[in-house]
Protein backbone atom coordinates (compact mmCIF):
# COMPACT_ATOMS: atom_id res chain seq x y z
CA UNK A 1 0.00 0.00 0.00
CA UNK A 2 1.56 3.24 -1.16
CA UNK A 3 0.67 6.32 0.88
CA UNK A 4 1.99 9.85 0.45
CA UNK A 5 1.08 13.08 2.23
CA UNK A 6 1.77 16.39 0.52
CA UNK A 7 4.20 18.81 2.14
CA UNK A 8 2.98 22.30 3.07
CA UNK A 9 4.61 23.69 -0.06
CA UNK A 10 2.86 21.09 -2.25
CA UNK A 11 -0.47 21.85 -0.53
CA UNK A 12 -0.03 25.58 -1.22
CA UNK A 13 0.92 24.80 -4.83
CA UNK A 14 -2.24 22.71 -5.30
CA UNK A 15 -4.35 25.53 -3.84
CA UNK A 16 -2.65 28.12 -6.05
CA UNK A 17 -3.21 26.05 -9.22
CA UNK A 18 -6.88 25.54 -8.34
CA UNK A 19 -7.27 29.29 -7.80
CA UNK A 20 -5.47 30.08 -11.07
CA UNK A 21 -7.43 27.59 -13.21
CA UNK A 22 -10.90 27.95 -11.66
CA UNK A 23 -10.75 31.64 -10.83
CA UNK A 24 -10.98 33.43 -7.51
CA UNK A 25 -14.79 33.41 -7.34
CA UNK A 26 -15.15 29.62 -7.74
CA UNK A 27 -12.13 28.93 -5.55
CA UNK A 28 -13.46 31.12 -2.72
CA UNK A 29 -16.95 29.63 -2.96
CA UNK A 30 -15.98 25.95 -3.18
CA UNK A 31 -12.34 25.34 -2.24
CA UNK A 32 -11.84 27.65 0.74
CA UNK A 33 -10.43 25.38 3.48
CA UNK A 34 -9.88 22.39 1.15
CA UNK A 35 -6.94 20.23 2.23
CA UNK A 36 -5.31 17.21 0.60
CA UNK A 37 -4.64 14.66 3.34
CA UNK A 38 -2.87 11.96 1.36
CA UNK A 39 -2.77 9.91 -1.81
CA UNK A 40 -3.18 6.16 -1.21
CA UNK A 41 -2.96 3.72 -4.14
CA UNK A 42 -4.10 6.35 -6.64
CA UNK A 43 -6.88 7.73 -4.43
CA UNK A 44 -6.61 11.33 -3.28
CA UNK A 45 -8.18 11.81 0.14
CA UNK A 46 -9.12 15.30 1.21
CA UNK A 47 -11.09 17.32 3.72
CA UNK A 48 -13.38 20.31 3.33
CA UNK A 49 -15.04 22.55 5.93
CA UNK A 50 -18.58 21.51 4.92
CA UNK A 51 -20.33 18.47 3.54
CA UNK A 52 -21.84 20.57 0.74
CA UNK A 53 -18.44 21.77 -0.48
CA UNK A 54 -17.07 18.22 -0.29
CA UNK A 55 -19.96 16.97 -2.44
CA UNK A 56 -19.51 19.77 -4.99
CA UNK A 57 -15.79 18.99 -5.30
CA UNK A 58 -16.52 15.25 -5.66
CA UNK A 59 -19.17 15.75 -8.34
CA UNK A 60 -18.02 18.79 -10.32
CA UNK A 61 -14.29 19.25 -9.79
CA UNK A 62 -12.77 15.82 -9.06
CA UNK A 63 -11.16 15.54 -12.52
CA UNK A 64 -9.47 18.94 -12.20
CA UNK A 65 -8.34 18.20 -8.63
CA UNK A 66 -6.90 14.84 -9.74
CA UNK A 67 -5.07 16.40 -12.69
CA UNK A 68 -3.55 19.20 -10.61
CA UNK A 69 -2.60 16.88 -7.73
CA UNK A 70 -0.88 14.35 -9.95
CA UNK A 71 1.15 17.07 -11.66
CA UNK A 72 2.16 18.59 -8.31
CA UNK A 73 2.86 15.29 -6.53
CA UNK A 74 4.33 13.40 -9.53
CA UNK A 75 2.12 10.45 -8.71
CA UNK A 76 -0.99 9.08 -10.47
CA UNK A 77 -4.37 10.07 -9.02
CA UNK A 78 -7.24 7.95 -10.34
CA UNK A 79 -9.91 8.84 -7.80
CA UNK A 80 -10.76 11.81 -5.57
CA UNK A 81 -12.57 11.32 -2.26
CA UNK A 82 -13.38 14.46 -0.25
CA UNK A 83 -15.19 14.39 3.09
CA UNK A 84 -16.21 17.00 5.63
CA UNK A 85 -13.36 17.91 7.99
CA UNK A 86 -13.09 15.45 10.86
CA UNK A 87 -14.79 12.51 9.12
CA UNK A 88 -12.81 9.34 8.54
CA UNK A 89 -12.00 7.92 5.12
CA UNK A 90 -10.94 4.46 6.27
CA UNK A 91 -9.90 3.78 9.86
CA UNK A 92 -7.01 1.53 8.92
CA UNK A 93 -5.42 4.21 6.76
CA UNK A 94 -6.50 7.43 8.51
CA UNK A 95 -3.66 9.92 9.02
CA UNK A 96 -2.66 10.45 12.63
Residue ranges: model-predicted function:
Residues 1-96:
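Intrinsically disordered, low-complexity basic tails and flexible linkers associated
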Amino acid sequence: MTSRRPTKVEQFAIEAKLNLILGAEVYDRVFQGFEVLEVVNGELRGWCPSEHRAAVIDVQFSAIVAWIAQTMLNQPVRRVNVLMRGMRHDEREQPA
